[in-house]
Amino acid sequence: MASILQYMRTDSPATVPPADTNDAHALVFRCHDPTPAALQRIGEAADQLQACRVAVWVSLDTTHIPEEPPSLLPILQHSPPRKKRRSEHRTPSQKVRRALATHIARGAVQIHEYDENDMIRTYPVLRDLKRNARLQESVEFSRGTHSLAWGLHAEALNVWYQHLERKPSFVWCFEDDVGFSGSLETLLDIVRRDCGDADLITADVKLRPSEAWWWLEVHSTAFAERYGNDVHNIYVSREHVQRFSMRFLDRLHVLSLQRVTCWSEALVPTIAHAENFGVAELPRLGTPFAHDGRVTAQEWEHITASRAGRRADRLYHALKF
């Protein structure tokens, strides 16, 4: 077995490396308010992966879920309030648990709920980052419709991962609007064969993002001091689907505690390259697989009907239905 010294750094905790026999994987779907179709895909993923003992989780960001204001109409009418029908005003948590009830009951899917405050309590640097001028100028944050979890995936993921009693050796992270035109067991087998035990598997890693990239200045002071804050030192990648090793997630956790963070599209690949973690390109990408990609329900039905050829066993983003 590899020496534990290979898994430690001078300012990181003594994390025990995964045992040679521990090849446990988990797949986490990042959600905020998933559609019925997205929940159906999550259930199908759990069915596909149950035989190979991959733990499937839903990581649900519950920030900015509006509470229903009390109705004044019954008071004005001097009448008792009507009982609400059960189908009315379900929260995302209720919708997730209802749609996946049978999977949850048999342990095929587990749910982790958190919000922005949980992230800030775990990583106090995020309180300062939320006041970043560039972040506050963005449409998403100026309207107050998005939480930090939308752009700081590493901390959102580690809020879940660092509290597990038994950590899996590798964690897949899927956005809930990703589709795979085949069995996810096939994807995991392809990655094991082609990428081995890489610490980070991600798509389209690039050095030097455009200076016009909106999120370039969204970083902590400690990040700039350690890695630089200009485009010549920064890597970016698409994060719709990624796989992390235990030791890489633990390292990201330590750095966040040390106030080293930035927008996660840049944070994850920049640290991986700067600190010599193993990085591999995510295979089996379909078209589209991009932040502005769109796949309709009709198109997805056609893609998944193609059981052979160039559309089979590929990842697509984004399934906006």
Residue ranges: model-predicted function:
Residues 179-269:
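Conserved catalytic core of nucleotide-sugar-dependent glycosyltransferases
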Residues 23-29, 53-56:
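Hydrophobic targeting segments
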Residues 253-321:
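C-terminal catalytic/acceptor-binding lobe
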Residues 168-177:
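Short beta-strand-to-loop acidic/aromatic patch adjacent to the donor-nucleotide binding site
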Residues 29-34, 58-62, 176:
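Structural motif
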Residues 1-26, 80-86:
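Juxtamembrane luminal stem/stalk of type II transmembrane Golgi/ER carbohydrate-processing enzymes
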Residues 65-82, 89-167:
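Active-site-proximal specificity loops/subdomain of glycosyltransferases
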Residues 4, 35-48, 94:
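Short, well-formed alpha-helical segments that are part of the catalytic scaffolds
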